[in-house]
Amino acid sequence: MPGGLEALRALPLLLFLSYACLGPGCQALRVEGGPPSLTVNLGEEARLTCENNGRNPNITWWFSLQSNITWPPVPLGPGQGTTGQLFFPEVNKNHRGLYWCQVIENNILKRSCGTYLRVRNPVPRPFLDMGEGTKNRIITAEGIILLFCAVVPGTLLLFRKRWQNEKFGVDMPDDYEDENLYEGLNLDDCSMYEDISRGLQGTYQDVGNLHIGDAQLEKP
């Protein structure tokens, strides 16, 4: 089959041409939009990149103030490397504005959407700059210390009281003391109280135990 042999011979050439056209030389120039904004603290460094698919592009950065429309864009010069990196070693308030890159390759010009650089004052660091895990461990240690301070003194007092009771015999029963409980009372006063209580017992009668016919109530 001569037709089949010719097709097999042309297959490597077709693969080579397809690979060459799929390479960077046959692709259209494309520039990534990039982040819409970048926030940097005052005095820190900032980096802006211009991502593109060019092989040897000519990258130029432009700058404009968003608040001043009448002020024309200012060219900042070429970027560094194939990504056209724009580097600020120390950012200040004058660096605020809109930055975009312009890529030229083979007379084809592309621009990025632009990135607005925000410069803010650094956030003051707290007095105790600790993570949440460290704070939780400190709170747990404080709880254990408070529990220790509450339980240990009370336990020591209980053991001390028990030791005193065992040493001086406070809790031991004393039969002699129970027998002489009323030793200090005056016997004359006791007999007088008994006479008075006995005299009051006959003043009132139990009405429930009396018969109706024999009921004779005493006059007050």
UniProtKB/Swiss-Prot annotation:
Modified-residue entries (Asymmetric dimethylarginine), positions: 198
Keywords noted in UniProt: Adaptive immunity, Cell membrane, Disulfide bond, Glycoprotein, Immunity, Immunoglobulin domain, Membrane, Methylation, Phosphoprotein, Receptor, Signal, Transmembrane, Transmembrane helix
Residues annotated as site: Required for binding to BLNK: 204
Record PTM: Phosphorylated on tyrosine, serine and threonine residues upon B-cell activation. Phosphorylation of tyrosine residues by Src-family kinases, including LYN, is an early and essential feature of the BCR signaling cascade. The phosphorylated tyrosines serve as docking sites for SH2-domain containing kinases, leading to their activation which in turn leads to phosphorylation of downstream targets. Phosphorylation of serine and threonine residues may prevent subsequent tyrosine phosphorylation. Arginine methylation in the ITAM domain may interfere with the binding of SYK. It promotes signals leading to B-cell differentiation.
Gene Ontology molecular function: any one: transmembrane signaling receptor activity
Variant or mutagenesis effect after changing residue 198 to K: Associates more strongly with SYK. Increases calcium response upon BCR ligation
GO biological processes: adaptive immune response; B cell activation; B cell differentiation; B cell proliferation; B cell receptor signaling pathway
Effect in UniProt of substituting residue 176 to F: Increases tyrosine phosphorylation. Inhibits phosphorylation of BLNK. Impaired antigen presentation
Tissue expression summary: B-cells.
Transmembrane segments: 138-159
Pfam (any one): ig
Domain Ig-like C2-type: 29-117
Phosphotyrosine found at: 182, 193, 204
List of glycosylated residues: 58, 68
Mutant phenotype after disruption: Mice display impaired B-cell development which does not progress pass the progenitor stage.
Residue ranges, Cytoplasmic side: 160-220
Bilayer topology: Single-pass type I membrane protein
Primary location group: membrane
Cystine residue pairs: 50-101
Function: Required in cooperation with CD79B for initiation of the signal transduction cascade activated by binding of antigen to the B-cell antigen receptor complex (BCR) which leads to internalization of the complex, trafficking to late endosomes and antigen presentation. Also required for BCR surface expression and for efficient differentiation of pro- and pre-B-cells. Stimulates SYK autophosphorylation and activation. Binds to BLNK, bringing BLNK into proximity with SYK and allowing SYK to phosphorylate BLNK. Also interacts with and increases activity of some Src-family tyrosine kinases.
Free-text comment about domains: The transmembrane helices of CD79A and CD79B chains and two IgM heavy chains assembly in a four-helix bundle structure that appears to be conserved among different BCR isotypes.
Subunit description: Heterodimer of alpha and beta chains; disulfide-linked. Part of the B-cell antigen receptor complex where the alpha/beta chain heterodimer is non-covalently associated with an antigen-specific membrane-bound surface immunoglobulin of two heavy chains and two light chains. Interacts through its phosphorylated ITAM domain with the SH2 domains of SYK which stimulates SYK autophosphorylation and activation.
Designated name of the protein: B-cell antigen receptor complex-associated protein alpha chain
Species, as recorded: Mus musculus (Mouse)
Chain's gene name: Cd79a
